[in-house]
Amino acid sequence: MSNAKTLYEKIYDAHVAVAAEGENPILYIDRHLVHEVTSPQAFDGLREKGRKIRQVGKTFATMDHNVSTQTKDINASGEMARIQMETLSKNCEEFGVTLYDLNHKYQGIVHVMGPELGITLPGMTIVCGDSHTATHGAFGSLAFGIGTSEVEHVLATQTLKQARAKTMKIDVKGKVAEGITAKDIVLAIIGKTTAAGGTGYVVEFCGEAITDLTMEGRMTVCNMAIELGAKAGLIAPDQTTFDYIAGRKFSPQGADLDAAIEYWSSLKTDDDAEFDAVVTLDASEIKPQVTWGTNPGQVIAVDAPIPAPESFADPVEKASAEKALAYMGLEAGKSLSDYNVDKVFVGSCTNSRIEDMRAAAAIAKGRKVASHVQALIVPGSEQVKAQAEKEGLDVIFKEAGFEWRLPGCSMCLAMNNDRLGPHERCASTSNRNFEGRQGRDGRTHLVSPAMAAAAAIAGHFVDIRTITEQA
């Protein structure tokens, strides 16, 4: 029997605190990220039982889900939002938790803030009451979303019961073509696996197309691991990772960093380790992707026709396609470029980092947003916003007719004022195109930042490769 382990197994095994026979092991949790929506009841539970937070120094909070992107006024997103944000402030003050509130220079989307501050490090277990916690797996950490009762458990004990997951390797072989982004890679992956293909697995993304990505690109890929049904997504840390971490606020410095890198370098799947499932993609075949349906697996290349329901052999997929086409107001056989978009959203924990802003700005520069389109650019954090403004990206966007907003989750999830009206069609860089996700009866198409910016200018979806060629 081989002792070879996958990256997931190495991190999982290193964090088992208690393994009682017949029960799920208890894992130690290295980092706990907290936001205003899933934490109020957890703090109430601590208060009722007279408990303190076990490791307050490993707990970090911010406000992101329902903050306004137009003003720092806490009342702007409505009563429920105000209550949640005020409650988070009160709870963090009472329990001694570090909070980056509305007016803090580190405020931002929780999954943007953690990595950019060096809170997220390789080999860690990281949890947050948010399904896209998988983002942090880009660093080779085991990161996953938890429910509110689990939030309370981690606050109280710094541990969590976790069953061992199955392992899946997703190998994206070779190099992608010019203009193909991390978002296109992950949408192509989900198109192949389907939105449920990773259920029960922790996925490790491998292959040249993955290791070629920057840290920000890797975060985009891992962010959407949950969208193929996986518990978490991982990418083994390498020199790209170490270079990104160096010099950040909470990352190790000097000799500590050298020692950490020596350990982090061991965090890779052993050569003869076996995965429970393997999925392979040819990177050179990946084109710019656009979702057409109501789950992220319903996705096509921008130049492909909208699929007909009868083209699906599986009766469940066929029925799902029929329902999705009706909801989305699309006709099989037509091109997605035949349909006008009403709104464009560049932002979310998937695509709101500085490289995403630069990619959208490169398309926006010297061009104008179509007259019928409202286009929002929402940086993922105050740090991203400041960097973008330093580079003059905000000016490029504003001159082109885009709205340059304040940081927050924004139009990803309709928990604030940024949302779609009924039947409005949106080119969005977010991660979920479910029915009503961006507003009741709203129609969401998931794309990369460059594709979103191009759609804003043309007024409909266009193949980014044709624009890049003209520039």
Curated annotation (Swiss-Prot):
> Could you tell me which CDD domains the record lists for this protein?
IPMI
Role this protein plays: Catalyzes the isomerization between 2-isopropylmalate and 3-isopropylmalate, via the formation of 2-isopropylmaleate.
Gene for this protein? leuC
Record text on subunit structure and interactions: Heterodimer of LeuC and LeuD.
Report the protein name in the record. 3-isopropylmalate dehydratase large subunit
Q: Which GO terms describe its molecular function?
A: 3-isopropylmalate dehydratase activity; 4 iron, 4 sulfur cluster binding; metal ion binding
Q: Which SUPFAM superfamilies match?
A: Aconitase iron-sulfur domain
Which terms are listed as keywords in the entry? 4Fe-4S, Amino-acid biosynthesis, Branched-chain amino acid biosynthesis, Iron, Iron-sulfur, Leucine biosynthesis, Lyase, Metal-binding
